[in-house]
């Protein structure tokens, strides 16, 4: 059954219902943003019906007293304070300002054209005077790729922030919108850059390739957008490429991303015949003219061969909206044609409610149809006042409070990105409430340290513009603020904190040291800086091997940092063989009764612990429980037991890797009046853990990577052979016009150097992405090899 048939069936089933019954209670026009790394909350049932042109009318009753009352309600009863009420009580001048602000990110699969699209946005908004392409073909490179490495490799490594103004025609007059924009990397190794950008943004543009459609990293980005409840519009890029099929991409958005999507444009021509688009809401043809497509020409005349497609897609747009918006559903039932204003209002409501994404089309590289996408950002993505942001009140046992984007209220902001510059540490801050002013003091909610703000700047890639203050809903950067990524700042009047972004665990490690010992100081500086900037870049010193170990999201991730150390700090490094982040887990339930007794005169050690260890049933973590009755072990010694359990889990008995999926229960024990201590019980627990663990037939777990490979169809057999050689589990294959895609779960251990083999097998035309999927029991032969290697290394160290 087709999507349209299902939709019509649903609408017919509503035909007998009274209109009032179709309107859910508790409508909410605005998206609900929970500032946490928790999974997606439920989507609001339906939007309100307040017309757009009335939402921002000046309210004469606004005053500082009103703002204070709103703040009080936001703290005491956040669930009763709607975003509409916040907007209606806003100062008229402030309402006018914030209604024209958009905080957006551009995200996509690698090589979908994010940076190229951003370059056109900056050019058409007048932010830059000339367009430069990625890879630095003209020895300049794209504006947002400010690092030499980015321009050389043609990839984005760090998210880059900028701002621009877009003048849009509304009802015959020009309206200026202020856009804060963040361009993000597409490579999975730099996923933290996407996480922290989406954490503080109100909306996003999801870019898809017209040929490839939804790809592996598109699915990852979609998951990240859902994690932070970010509404999005979609832009199908590369419409001029051979094999482009935008409607297949829209179908994939519906099916693979499980998101209602419909075109708001149709192309005029495809591939090398692509000339422009038809706006199917207003039924106008749109073309770009001028050397770089800077002139937008609208025509009422739609090409005869395109009109039937435009009319059919307009009908499909209305049907899709009827499925997610009550107003359009009512018009559909009454067989009335919605007006342009009604359609745009419905698209905006459904987009902000995250039940729908409007799909635009164009070619950034060919300078076609980028400006209509800019109009879509203004029309359909929310302003900061339309997104609900929550914080935690530390004075009220971390009760949830709503942040109110009024400039007059006490300041609350979140540091979401750190960067080293020539002038010191640069801290990017999103202002959620109040105003951040130069020269004022702010307080770090994590450590309650007071910090003076010496300089505030607005960033334009690697350039900056000094400002004296930044209002609610804006993004800026400050100098001289010592903090960590994810810290909350206030002006001291409120004791609020905001939860940080989701940080994935590293999957690959390698040893590193400077080739020349005189470079140790710079080596340490670089390591410390990179750790502050990137939460997924981890460093620790292995006391047994006496090596510095760096960990990250993939080979490319660590290679980039090694190269940055050479370029930015002039430190050449030697690196060891990449190490896989294996894990260990218990095999079966085992009981233990362990006594630690050392009494040789003077203070001794005495601790007895008894209980059992067993699998938890999942690999999310480990559990420690005490079921002591009769006080055989005192409370303070039980804390020591729990600490010993944690230390034992940090370094497993099999090969020294972390333990997962293990529960330890202590239900009995004994103490000595003088010889028992916290140290004794900590050591006894660790010893009991090791013995019980080894008796349980334990397993080594290896990380399996979700791997997606795309290559020309003629190389399919060679690629499958490469995967079979690595014992990969092939989950699915898709065959396109001239290329194929393989989805597989691969052992990370078998994927080192895979890019070289793939290039050789596909004449350099194949590409692949990997991201962590899950842990699986390692094959028996691999477990034996790893244990033998570990024991050999341990024996060698003990000989020294």
Swiss-Prot record:
Family in the record: Belongs to the TRAFAC class translation factor GTPase superfamily. Classic translation factor GTPase family. EF-G/EF-2 subfamily.
Residue pairs linked by disulfide bridges in the UniProt entry: none
Domain tr-type G: from-to ranges: 99-385
Keywords: Elongation factor, GTP-binding, Mitochondrion, Nucleotide-binding, Protein biosynthesis, Transit peptide
Organism annotation: Coccidioides immitis (strain RS) (Valley fever fungus)
Pathway: Protein biosynthesis; polypeptide chain elongation
Pfam family, one: GTP_EFTU_D2
PROSITE patterns for this protein: G_TR_1, G_TR_2
Organism classification: Eukaryota, Fungi, Dikarya, Ascomycota, Pezizomycotina
Any one GO molecular function term: GTPase activity
A single Gene Ontology CC term: mitochondrion
Function: Mitochondrial GTPase that catalyzes the GTP-dependent ribosomal translocation step during translation elongation. During this step, the ribosome changes from the pre-translocational (PRE) to the post-translocational (POST) state as the newly formed A-site-bound peptidyl-tRNA and P-site-bound deacylated tRNA move to the P and E sites, respectively. Catalyzes the coordinated movement of the two tRNA molecules, the mRNA and conformational changes in the ribosome.
Keyword Transit peptide belongs to the record: yes
Name of this chain's protein: Elongation factor G, mitochondrial
Entries under HAMAP family matching the protein: EF_G_EF_2_B
Location, primary (coarse class): mitochondrion
Chain positions recorded as GTP binding sites: 108-115, 183-187, 237-240
Transit peptide limits: 1-34
Cellular compartment(s): Mitochondrion
GO biological process per UniProt: mitochondrial translational elongation
